[in-house]
């Protein structure tokens, strides 16, 4: 299996276990976790499996008010990525950004909390499926 050095923008390659999604209607802060990721290379080779296979954070904190994605304090990683484009429309939350030569896009179903993430960098594409739940405690 080829590893891609997927950064926080690859973000949601989070937990290897199934997560439970929740209603995010009106929420500004939530926690996301992923259950499955697929990474494909320009040569046509693809790898697929649990998100933890790529050694990425187990959880990602999403802060819409401050437009940022962060690892949790418990991860010990202290990584933050800015959200450059944020839209809430037709029951969806769309987050997009670009950092370290990687572009990312999240599509979150606001009612169910289910999330699909796409990450792209030169010759590599990653897709991640997961779930988000409201975050009620302070950062």
Question: Which residues does each PLM region occupy?
Answer:
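Short, solvent-exposed loop/hinge segments that bridge or flank secondary-structure elements
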Residues: 26-27, 31-66
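Short, exposed beta-strand-loop hairpins at the edges of beta-sheets
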Residues: 106-107, 116-127
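Hydrophobic/aromatic beta-strand elements that line small-molecule binding cavities or substrate pockets
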Residues: 58-60, 103-108, 130-134
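Bacterial N-terminal signal peptides
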Residues: 5-15
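Short polybasic amphipathic segments
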Residues: 37, 66-72, 115-117
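Contiguous, well-ordered beta-strand patches that form the walls/edges
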Residues: 64-102
């Amino acid at each position: 299996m080829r590893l891609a050095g997927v950064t926080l923008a690859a973000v949601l390659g989070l937990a290897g276990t199934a997560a439970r999604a929740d209603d995010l209607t009106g929420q500004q802060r939530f926690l996301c976790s992923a259950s499955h990721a697929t990474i494909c290379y320009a040569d046509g080779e693809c790898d697929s499996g649990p998100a933890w296979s790529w050694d990425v954070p187990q959880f990602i904190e999403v802060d819409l008010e401050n437009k940022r994605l962060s690892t949790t304090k418990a991860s010990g990683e202290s990584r933050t990525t800015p959200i450059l484009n944020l839209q809430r429309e037709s029951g969806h939350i769309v987050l997009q950004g670009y950092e370290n030569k990687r572009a990312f896009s999240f599509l979150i179903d606001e009612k169910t909390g289910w999330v699909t993430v796409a990450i792209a960098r030169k010759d590599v594409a990653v897709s991640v499926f997961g779930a988000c739940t409201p975050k009620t405690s302070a950062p």
